[in-house]
């Protein structure tokens, strides 16, 4: 008798066919990778196919693969990753679609399929700059209105570009260039034989 994960894998391959870029199993979960051009249609199939029935989107996030594998990775930089649940069949799936353009990452919005994707996609847009085409209200959700850049990108400086402070003369919050100097954080190594200045 086939296990649940084997059954799901067979159902996915049968329903999606050539649209599957890769389908891998790790830690008891399947990860399905599809092209950005197929992302929306695949999501509809995952929800509507009677042998799949992924009724619920649990989570959606962006990922920046710029330094993945110690920089050895040379594939697309940004991906949208969705975690889906089939309440009917009691199985889960991770769906990943890589944006083909690193300079302007665009993937389709899943809001029309799972309304719970709304704020998740806004968050991924705000933090990674991934544009979700067809989203009804794609604007920042976590950072300030005038924020420049996308803070979860690997090339975004830890200290940021601007800082805000209250100006008592203007009686309002103002933005100014960051006054913190960027620095390399190196962990402190404690040698046991000289710990605390004591010689053992």
From Swiss-Prot:
It catalyses: a quinone + NADH + 5 H(+)(in) = a quinol + NAD(+) + 4 H(+)(out). GO terms for molecular function: NADH dehydrogenase (ubiquinone) activity; NADH:ubiquinone reductase (non-electrogenic) activity; quinone binding. Keywords: Cell inner membrane, Cell membrane, Membrane, NAD, Quinone, Translocase, Transport, Ubiquinone. Belongs to the complex I 30 kDa subunit family. NDH-1 shuttles electrons from NADH, via FMN and iron-sulfur (Fe-S) centers, to quinones in the respiratory chain. The immediate electron acceptor for the enzyme in this species is believed to be ubiquinone. Couples the redox reaction to proton translocation (for every two electrons transferred, four hydrogen ions are translocated across the cytoplasmic membrane), and thus conserves the redox energy in a proton gradient. PANTHER family: NADH DEHYDROGENASE [UBIQUINONE] IRON-SULFUR PROTEIN 3, MITOCHONDRIAL (PTHR10884:SF14), NADH DEHYDROGENASE UBIQUINONE IRON-SULFUR PROTEIN 3 (PTHR10884). This is NADH-quinone oxidoreductase subunit C. It comes from Burkholderia cenocepacia (strain HI2424).
């Amino acid at each position: 008798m086939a296990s649940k994960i084997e059954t799901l894998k067979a159902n996915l391959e049968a329903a999606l066919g050539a649209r599957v870029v890769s389908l891998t199993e790790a830690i008891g979960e399947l990860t399905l990778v599809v092209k950005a051009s197929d992302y929306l249609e695949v999501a509809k199939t995952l929800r509507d196919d009677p042998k799949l029935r992924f009724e619920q989107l649990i989570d959606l996030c962006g990922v920046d693969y710029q330094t993945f594998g110690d920089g050895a990775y040379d594939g697309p930089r940004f991906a949208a990753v969705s975690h889906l649940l089939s309440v009917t069949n009691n199985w889960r799936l991770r769906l990943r679609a890589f944006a083909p353009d690193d300079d302007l990452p665009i993937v389709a919005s899943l809001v029309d399929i799972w309304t719970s994707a709304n704020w998740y996609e806004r968050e991924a847009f705000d933090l990674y700059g991934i544009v979700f085409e067809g989203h009804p209200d794609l604007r920042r959700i976590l950072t300030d209105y005038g924020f420049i850049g996308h803070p979860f990108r690997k090339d975004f400086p830890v200290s940021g570009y601007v800082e805000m402070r209250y100006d008592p003369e203007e009686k309002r919050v103002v933005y100014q260039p960051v006054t913190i100097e960027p620095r390399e954080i190196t962990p402190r190594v404690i040698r046991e034989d000289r710990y605390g200045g004591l010689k053992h």
